[in-house]
């Protein structure tokens, strides 16, 4: 059932971009502004982004999902190409990953840092550096969102 809901949320044709961020955030109890901050950092909101890392791995889509997750994606019926062609899938999968890191580290900034730097104890400094950058972006995006909501 959970897989069906995940698929449904990712592929409903009328699902607008704003709804995609909000739905992913609601499903995993993550502020949509935080997801947007990560997307801004990871890809500059480029839904077609593909990047090769120093270790040879690749990151795909607006949320730069690493090919480390390829096996898991295939088990769920997805591919790396779908992360590009269906940006909402990328957003939902990223929210799912971030939620898993929050289960490991608690609902704090080290979990956000793990999204990029991973969970190795040796990567704590990198996690915190990434999290600081995301925090600044998050504050700006959240403030812009509040400002836009006041204009309505």
Curated annotation (Swiss-Prot):
Where are the disulfide bridges?
none
- Which protein family is named in the record? Belongs to the IagB/IpgF/P19 family.
What is any Pfam family matched here? SLT
InterPro entries in the record: Lysozyme-like_dom_sf, Transglycosylase_SLT_dom_1
- Give the range the annotation lists for the signal sequence: 1-17
Q: What is this protein called?
A: Protein IpgF
Classification via Gene3D superfamilies: 1.10.530.10
What UniProt keywords apply to this chain's record, in alphabetical order?
A: Plasmid, Signal, Virulence
**Species whose genome carries this gene:** Shigella flexneri
């Amino acid at each position: 059932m959970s897989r069906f809901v995940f698929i449904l949320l990712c592929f409903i044709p009328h699902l607008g971009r704003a709804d995609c961020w909000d739905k992913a955030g609601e499903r995993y109890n993550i502020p949509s502004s935080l997801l947007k901050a990560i997307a801004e950092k990871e890809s500059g909101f480029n839904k077609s982004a593909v990047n090769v890392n120093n270790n040879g791995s690749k990151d795909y889509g607006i949320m730069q999902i690493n090919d480390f997750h390829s096996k898991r994606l295939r088990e769920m019926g997805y591919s790396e190409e779908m992360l590009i062609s269906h940006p909402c899938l990328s957003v939902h999968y990223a929210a799912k990953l971030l939620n898993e890191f929050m289960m490991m580290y608690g609902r704090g900034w080290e979990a956000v840092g793990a999204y990029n730097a991973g969970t190795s104890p040796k990567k704590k400094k990198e996690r915190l550096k990434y999290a600081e950058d995301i925090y600044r972006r998050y504050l700006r995006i959240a403030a812009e969102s509040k400002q836009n909501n006041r204009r309505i």
